[in-house]
From Swiss-Prot:
Residues 82-183 form the Thioredoxin domain. This is Thioredoxin-like protein CITRX, chloroplastic. InterPro entries: CITRX (IPR044182), Thioredoxin-like_sf (IPR036249), Thioredoxin_domain (IPR013766). It comes from Arabidopsis thaliana (Mouse-ear cress). Thiol-disulfide oxidoreductase that plays a role in proper chloroplast development, most likely through regulating plastid-encoded polymerase (PEP) dependent chloroplast transcription. Acts as a component of the transcriptionally active plastid chromosome that is required for plastid gene expression.
Length: 183
């Protein structure tokens, strides 16, 4: 139990409440406060099951924290390895191939992934859209001279046409124009 002493101001001659008026001397005002440790449902500290401070309220987890990199299986834009991508580029295709070089920690890459998902819905069977994680495929990204993220490669099914490369977040309309007019 902790006792906290509070002094009253000398200019206050009239009591503020019936409780304060029952006190004999203004300087004898004591506020009693009990401080009890709160039991936490989990603890991340190695010092035991006590929270960081006796006044700290425990947090409740709404869902488990994410563990590692996670790519959903129901995404239309599939993650490929370097070897799978090279086989796809060398194979026969009738539709353009869009390759997204991204990183999971990159904010613009996350925004680009949303736009590419919308693009994959619109060009369902008229384009193949894949992505490559530059953290997992570092050497391949270096060989492809990926300097900024996100980097997109638009590869035409016609081998005589050069690939179109973009760096940074580009609007959805620009991707439409490249696929419709340049491929």
């Amino acid at each position: 139990m902790a006792l906290v002493q509070s002094r009253t101001f000398p200019h206050l001659n009239t009591p503020l409440s019936p409780i304060l008026s029952s006190l004999h001397a203004p300087s004898s005002l004591f506020i009693r406060r009990e401080i009890r440790p709160v039991a936490a449902p989990f603890s991340s500290s190695t010092a035991g099951n006590l929270p960081f401070s006796p006044l700290t309220r425990p947090r409740k987890l709404l869902c488990p924290p994410p563990r590692g990199k996670f790519v959903r299986e129901d995404y239309l834009v599939k993650k490929l390895s370097a070897q799978e991508l090279q086989e796809l580029v060398k194979g026969d295709r009738k539709v353009p191939l869009i390759v997204d070089f991204y990183a999971t920690w990159c904010g613009p890459c996350i925004l680009m992934a949303q736009e590419l998902e919308m693009l994959a819905v619109e060009y369902e069977s008229n384009a193949i859209i894949v992505k490559v994680d530059t953290d997992d495929e570092y050497e391949f990204a270096r060989d492809m001279q990926v300097r900024g993220l996100p980097t997109l490669f638009f590869i035409s099914p016609d081998p005589s046409k050069d690939a179109i490369r973009t760096e940074g977040l580009i609007p959805l309309q620009m991707m439409h124009d490249i696929i419709d007019n340049e491929m």
